[in-house]
């Protein structure tokens, strides 16, 4: 029963990516990585799609420090700092809460009755495609290091924007 908690955790993390650095199409590989996990937990591909794509898009819509729209727009408007930051965080929290509730409601319905999924027929084929074989190596040290470097890099960008007022040149 606790696997359902993975939905809000992932959506919040991806939403933070959307709101801070404009994560958008960068999430496509996450779909491929997460779909077998969510299949194994009894969910459908639409649940995985909503988690991976709605999370960052909600973040992008309520951008806080996203250099691709907030910082450029504020620069063009001559606004220094980020005076609407608190409002944007509140708006992000409201939109994320509503979206997470919707996705969790859908996911629980599908888990209870898989044939009610709008992607049921397609998922039967996808489940065969994503079956693991003995050649799969799992999550290696190299994979962990790549994720660590990515996370540190994103953290540095967010820190630079918030603490030092970095703009496009510094990023």
Where are the regions that the model predicts?
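Hydrophobic transmembrane alpha-helices that form the pore/transport pathway of multi-pass ion
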Residues: 2-60
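Membrane-core helix-loop-helix motifs of multi-pass transport proteins
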Residues: 36-120, 137
């Amino acid at each position: 029963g606790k696997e359902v908690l993975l939905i809000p955790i992932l959506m919040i993390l991806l939403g933070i990516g959307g709101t801070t650095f404009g994560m958008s199409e960068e999430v496509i590989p996450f779909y491929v990585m997460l779909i077998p996990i969510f299949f194994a937990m009894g969910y459908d591909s639409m649940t995985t799609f909503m988690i991976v794509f709605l999370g960052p898009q909600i973040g992008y819509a309520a951008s806080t420090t996203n250099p691709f729209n907030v910082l450029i727009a504020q620069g063009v408007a001559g606004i220094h700092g980020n005076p609407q930051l608190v409002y944007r965080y509140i708006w992000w929290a409201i939109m994320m809460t509503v979206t997470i509730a919707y996705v969790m409601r859908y996911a629980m319905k599908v888990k209870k009755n898989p044939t009610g999924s709008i992607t049921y027929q397609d998922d039967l084929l996808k489940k065969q495609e994503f079956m693991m074989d003995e050649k799969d190596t799992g999550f290696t040290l190299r994979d962990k290091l790549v994720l660590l470097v990515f996370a540190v890099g994103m953290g540095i960008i967010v820190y630079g924007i918030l603490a030092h007022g970095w703009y496009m040149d510094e990023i």
